[in-house]
Amino acid sequence: MQINKAALEIFDFTSSLAVYSEHELKVGDQAIQDYIANHVAKAFKDPGARTGTLHDASPFGKQLVEYKKGDLKFIDLSKNLGESLFTYMKQATDSVVIDTIICEAVTDTTYICILLCQAHDAFTHQLFSEDDGTLATELVSHKAVLPMPSQKLRAFASINLHDFSVRIFEPKGEFDGEVSYILADKVLQLGTNQSSRDTVKKVKAIVDKVSQAHESDGVVELTTAKSMIAKNAEVSDTVDPVRIVEEVFKANPIQQEAAKKELADADMMRPLPVNREFATKVGEHHKIKTDTGIEISFPVEYMKNREFIEIKTNDDGTLRIELKNINKIMNK
């Protein structure tokens, strides 16, 4: 990934002060290049990101069109966006300092990215020379330290300059008494699909709910659903909830229809975007917990093979879990 341009706008909500830069950041500095690029690369993979499309007739969409044509300078685009962000956020944000980085990032295509970095307090060391010539070390407090690339940004949005598709994650805020997404709803003015995490979570919840309602523990059904989600991610960046419940409940039409009704109520009767890396991890392991407090985590594929694990019903209606072909047990 290459960061071509970047600008930094400072939002100090402790004093309702905003500072807009008149110059771009020096992205030729390798440390700055790496810092921004690493944050963007990580944010691209966030399973909590929602997707949508920016309309080119929206206020910011029009500015991006001008920018693509060369009629609007990057630093002016950044300042305009910063002013819009601050106008909405100052009414919906706690007393914190947020440094906003706006950049042009290039991978296989070009993106305009918005990184909201919430500053935090941190300490570093400093070396002093005393009057008598001896050396002293001190802890020095810094009040506005940005998150490291290993830490999550407060909010992030990327707009593909080719098709104006958007990936975005952010916390909700309250504006004029209404709880909403400030960046998506107010600044960019776009509708979004739910995140990969929410999509997978809802599919699992529906499968579990329908299974439990029809006197099943849901283990087989859930592991089947998770396995399908993971295998689908090997070839597609969307997941079809309808196909999943049809396969999971193929032996029981009543359960299948109940699951489809739940999907319809959740507006999930269509293929939905999913982060392939996240979806693949979903299908790796399944965890169960008994009412006696025992927890077991096992590879999803093992539920299809009775040589490793099997859940049986005793004559008195209780369950037993058999773990097989074990050569060694390790404490964790």
Give short role names for the model-derived ranges.
Residues 2-282:
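Long, hydrophobic alpha/beta structural blocks
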Residues 246-332:
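C-terminal structured domains
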